[in-house]
Amino acid sequence: MYKVYLKSGKEESLKRFHPWVFSGAIAHFDGEPEEGEVVEIYTSKKEFIAKGHFQIGSIAVRVLSFHQDEAIDSDFWKRKLSIAYEMRRSIGIAENPTNNTYRLVHGEGDNLPGLIIDIYARTAVMQAHSAGMHLDRMEITRSEERRV
């Protein structure tokens, strides 16, 4: 996995769990990640701070996890989608007999920047607004299709 090193002081927003790394905050990469690849983010002092999808542009990394040992795999997607679903169920949006339409995933609001999932009865509609979410779309779909 490629590593992204931040300029000194640019980790402060990530310490407050901001979901993005802007391109201007990056000092250098160790290698040349492809768009959509998961990269690890390190401070200027080489301390791990987060991992996320890399993309060329002003938002260079969309953070998926602040835990170094958390793999971005099928279990990750199942867990994140289950958390989103349970939150909506607990407030009466999902499993509501008077409404079968709701937004399951609100991107950054559900710690999944670049991803939107809307539920219409037994149909899920996914929008991938980043290269990484686009690349992971089939794994995300497999994780959600069991519920819909």
Predicted regions span which residues?
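RNA-binding accessory domains that recognize and position tRNA/RNA substrates
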Residues: 1-147
